[in-house]
Amino acid sequence: MDSNTVSSFQVDCFLWHVRKRFADQELGDAPFLDRLRRDQKSLRGRGNTLGLDIETATCAGKQIVERILEEESDEALKMPAPRYLTDMTLEEMSRDWFMLMPKQKVAGSLCIKMDQAIMDKNIILKANFSVIFDRLETLILLRAFTEEGAIVGEISPLPSLPGHTDEDVKNAIGVLIGGLEWNDNTVRVSETLQRFAWRSSDEDGRPPLPPNQKRKMARTIESEV
């Protein structure tokens, strides 16, 4: 087992413990508590996969964090400011668009829309989003464009459900790609979005989605939207 995998799990366990103590003092807001519950489920799953005890991992994670804090200056503890990256122009973001065969799905705090009438097109996904620590932090808006510039799909945050992770965004993109490819469209993702959401891609601009996810997502669009 990779040592970085183990130490990452240990630190995550300890930081979750700190956040839980914070929540126990009734100081956390609703999004904070929601993330706490989701992360607890994730840690349990990772612990089972790795064969590690969470309580033991938490103690080890505490030692790692304490060692890091002893070496850190106050200057190093400052949170870097997020960067705002734009694939789309203001006109592309604000343009109204219409669907001949509208399909819509809500996935967590993200709304996915697409036009099921679009077939046999080359489509590119563009997004405007913020980045921190060289990873996607917050999606502002994602849209799917044909080569002719027509908008045929969209992913946007729901104002009533604030807060999403980069994994939420990647899952939503998987749904959109699956739905568009169901109609024999060829979909690629902008280089900027690939870099900060996946940090890798295929040569044709596809993010590394496994084939079974593509089929699953396509069926989801077809049957549930």
From Swiss-Prot:
Note down the stretches annotated as region RNA-binding and homodimerization: 1-73
Where are the annotated segments for Disordered? 200-225
Post-translational modification here is noted as: Upon interferon induction, ISGylated via host HERC5; this results in the impairment of NS1 interaction with RNA targets due to its inability to form homodimers and to interact with host EIF2AK2/PKR.
Write out the entry's keywords from A to Z: Eukaryotic host gene expression shutoff by virus, Host cytoplasm, Host gene expression shutoff by virus, Host mRNA suppression by virus, Host nucleus, Host-virus interaction, Inhibition of host innate immune response by virus, Inhibition of host interferon signaling pathway by virus, Inhibition of host PKR by virus, Inhibition of host pre-mRNA processing by virus, Inhibition of host RIG-I by virus, Inhibition of host RLR pathway by virus, Interferon antiviral system evasion, RNA-binding, Ubl conjugation, Viral immunoevasion
Q: Where is this motif: Nuclear export signal?
A: 132-141
**GO CC terms of this entry:** host cell cytoplasm; host cell nucleus
Example GO molecular function: RNA binding
The entry's free-text remark on domains says: The dsRNA-binding region is required for suppression of RNA silencing.
Q: Which family does it belong to?
A: Belongs to the influenza A viruses NS1 family.
Q: How does it assemble?
A: Homodimer. Interacts with host TRIM25 (via coiled coil); this interaction specifically inhibits TRIM25 multimerization and TRIM25-mediated RIGI CARD ubiquitination. Interacts with human EIF2AK2/PKR, CPSF4, IVNS1ABP and PABPN1.
Q: What protein name applies here?
A: Non-structural protein 1
Q: Could you tell me which species this protein originates from?
A: Influenza A virus (strain A/Chicken/Hong Kong/FY150/2001 H5N1 genotype D)
Q: Which gene encodes it?
A: NS
